[in-house]
């Protein structure tokens, strides 16, 4: 994508340097249950920002929309199938430091932790947290450092 979020026609493979002036598309997905709790996953210890808590997310693949990438990432990392209809795009930004357009989605879904199938190379644990605990984890810097919008999420 160019700086106006228009497709550039250039495909950059994972691990390659993104040319200056171009951006890739990334998504984060927050899942909230009927009790108003947010689902957090804990990063694998061998990943960057080891053992930090975060919502699910990743890079959108070539040919996918932001929404499709969000659905795929949650299925891959947590084994949860999200269905269209409960989603809301809650935040968008262009982040120069990581050369991406960043979309944040919110889905409503009730699922028990024991029903999830964690991707072992990505996620080591999951938990449901209430908004107060989420904000406290943010304040204590227990969340992935790129998550900077928690106040907007929980309003």
Question: PLM features: what roles do these ranges have?
Answer:
Residues 60-145:
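Unchanged
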Residues 26-57:
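A glycine-rich, hydrophobic loop/mini-helix early in the fold
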Residues 19-21, 49-54, 127:
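A short, polar/proline- and glycine-enriched secondary-structure boundary/capping micro-motif
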Residues 4, 33-36, 44, 108-113, ...:
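Short loop segments at secondary-structure junctions
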Residues 142-155:
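Charged phosphate-binding loop/patch that engages nucleotide di/tri-phosphates or the phosphate backbone
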Residues 1-28, 34:
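Acidic, metal-coordinating catalytic segment for phosphate/diphosphate chemistry
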Residues 15, 57-58:
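Short helix/strand-bridging catalytic loops that position acidic/His residues to coordinate divalent metals
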